């Protein structure tokens, strides 16, 4: 993976995904403060972020590296009309890697074509969020003890939620079975379903969250975005795809609830105290997964 661009999950082999997860587990168990010594990473966030940006910056510094960058594209020369290609040419001439989030789909792939150093996609529009998927895989294996043959439900906004697109693609390499629970207007995109069909991966489209909970090893919740509905329709959908603690009474003992965060109303606060809640530990795992990725991309051996 040395000097590899990290743009989308389909660019990874199963073996590479396992390598990142294994390395993350090792770094969580035995921290290393020297893996990015003398390395400089650019953190280029053209779109707001809390967890992704801060966990990347934490990862770089804990590995002994240095970081430069910006948290808002409005404060850069992009506001003056500079193209992304020109910006990346310049930024990559200063640094050893570029971590980038951008609101436009395909922006990370474009950046990689003009960068002199590896580009790591921190999210491009509603398209891909590969490093979120890596921390999700790490959290899933940490809680389930394996990645192979799991049953996973995705619930909420499956159309615009880039995290579920990437994670479905990744877990398909491990023979997962899926439940897709969403309103019809926010269903999993056809291209993801077609990819799963081609691989012979089983999935079921469902409209009842409570009905699928007893069947799954992992429940992956996402936020239904208020701005996509009128108020009456949103209130109806919101209640239908919100998780409460009482809905977990028939869940498998080891089942874990994940969420890319931020949550709004789709997971009630009373779920936090249940043994199934794992979304805060999942967010914490973002540092270890991103440490692993940076170490593998910027070192020939780790």
Swiss-Prot record:
The keyword Zinc-finger does not apply. It is an enzyme of class 2 (transferase). It catalyses: carbamoyl phosphate + L-aspartate = N-carbamoyl-L-aspartate + phosphate + H(+). One of its GO terms (cellular component) is cytosol. The keyword Transferase applies. Carbamoyl phosphate binds at residues 51-52, 101, 129, 132, 261-262. It holds the Pfam family OTCace. One of its GO terms (molecular function) is amino acid binding. L-aspartate binds at residues 80, 162, 223. One of its GO terms (biological process) is 'de novo' UMP biosynthetic process. Keywords: Pyrimidine biosynthesis, Transferase. Its EC number is 2.1.3.2. SUPFAM superfamilies: Aspartate/ornithine carbamoyltransferase. Pathway: Pyrimidine metabolism; UMP biosynthesis via de novo pathway; (S)-dihydroorotate from bicarbonate: step 2/3. InterPro entries: Asp/Orn_carbamoyltranf_P-bd, Asp/Orn_carbamoylTrfase, Asp/Orn_carbamoylTrfase_sf, Asp_carbamoyltransf, Asp_carbamoyltransf_Asp/Orn-bd. Catalyzes the condensation of carbamoyl phosphate and aspartate to form carbamoyl aspartate and inorganic phosphate, the committed step in the de novo pyrimidine nucleotide biosynthesis pathway. Belongs to the aspartate/ornithine carbamoyltransferase superfamily. ATCase family. NCBIfam families: asp_carb_tr, PRK00856.1. Heterododecamer (2C3:3R2) of six catalytic PyrB chains organized as two trimers (C3), and six regulatory PyrI chains organized as three dimers (R2). This is Aspartate carbamoyltransferase catalytic subunit. The lineage of its organism: Bacteria, Pseudomonadati, Pseudomonadota, Betaproteobacteria, Neisseriales. The gene is pyrB.
């Amino acid at each position: 993976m040395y000097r590899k661009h990290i743009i989308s999950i389909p660019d990874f082999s199963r073996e590479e995904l396992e390598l990142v997860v294994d390395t993350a587990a090792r770094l969580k168990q035995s921290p290393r403060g020297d893996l990015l010594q003398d390395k400089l990473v650019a953190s280029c966030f053209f779109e707001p972020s809390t967890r992704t940006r801060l966990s990347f910056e934490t990862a770089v510094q804990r590995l002994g590296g240095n970081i430069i960058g910006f948290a808002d594209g409005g404060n850069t020369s992009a506001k003056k009309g500079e193209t992304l290609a020109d910006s990346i040419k310049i930024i990559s001439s200063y640094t050893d890697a570029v971590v980038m989030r951008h609101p436009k789909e395909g922006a990370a792939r474009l950046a990689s074509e003009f960068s002199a150093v590896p580009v790591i996609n921190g999210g491009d529009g509603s398209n891909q969020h590969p490093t979120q998927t890596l921390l999700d895989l790490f959290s899933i294996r940490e809680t389930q003890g394996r990645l192979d043959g799991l049953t996973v439900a995705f619930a909420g906004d499956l159309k615009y939620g880039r995290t579920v697109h990437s994670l479905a693609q990744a877990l398909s390499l491990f023979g997962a079975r899926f439940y897709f629970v969403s309103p019809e207007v926010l269903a999993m995109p056809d291209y993801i379903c077609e990819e799963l069909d081609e691989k012979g991966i089983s999935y079921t489209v469902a409209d009842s969250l409570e009905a699928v909970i007893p069947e799954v090893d992992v429940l992956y919740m996402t936020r239904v975005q208020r701005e996509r509905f009128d108020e009456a329709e949103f209130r109806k959908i919101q209640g239908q795809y919100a998780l409460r603690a009482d809905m977990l009474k028939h869940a498998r003992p080891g089942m874990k609830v994940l969420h890319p965060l931020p949550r709004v109303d789709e997971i009630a606060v009373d779920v936090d105290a249940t043994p199934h809640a794992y979304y805060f530990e999942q967010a914490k795992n973002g540092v270890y997964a991103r440490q692993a990725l940076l170490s593998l991309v910027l070192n020939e051996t780790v």
